Amino acid sequence: MNWVFLCLAILFEVAGTVSMKLSSGFTKLIPSLLLIFFYGGSLFFLTLTLKSIDVSVAYAVWSGMGIVLITVVGFLFFQEHVSVMKVISIGLIIAGVVSLNLIEHVAVSEPVHKSGQYK
């Protein structure tokens, strides 16, 4: 369930960012209210996520995947330019998120002494 909460946090964060763009600097009421709702929801689900996923992993996945998704949304819906360098950078973000997930699974299976040293 913890990864479901993290996915919801990411989706709410992306919806909040889209609402921010549509609010035109808080000059449009409905997008401004949606911005507050979606960012509040994102932080709510991120907080639930942190009960069972390390903050370093959860925050990296949340921010990294948020960047990836909002870049795609910007390209598809706001006609934002996507350069080759941006695509390479997004690929590196995805590789980092995958690496963090793999490391977390390895770390869970390796017990640690209270001193912080591996057995």
Curated annotation (Swiss-Prot):
Which Gene Ontology molecular function entries are recorded, alphabetically? transmembrane transporter activity
Membrane-topology descriptor: Multi-pass membrane protein
Span-the-membrane segments of this chain are 3-23, 29-49, 58-78, 87-107
Which GO cellular component terms are attached? plasma membrane
Record organism: Bacillus subtilis (strain 168)
| Upper classification of the organism | Bacteria, Bacillati, Bacillota, Bacilli, Bacillales
Entry keyword Cell membrane: yes
Protein family (similarity comment): Belongs to the drug/metabolite transporter (DMT) superfamily. Small multidrug resistance (SMR) (TC 2.A.7.1) family.
Keyword Transmembrane included in the entry's annotation: yes
Q: Main subcellular localization, coarse class?
A: membrane
Q: What is the name of the protein in this document?
A: Uncharacterized membrane protein YvaE
Keyword annotations: Cell membrane, Membrane, Transmembrane, Transmembrane helix, Transport
- Domain of life, per UniProt, equals Bacteria
Where can this protein be found?
A: Cell membrane
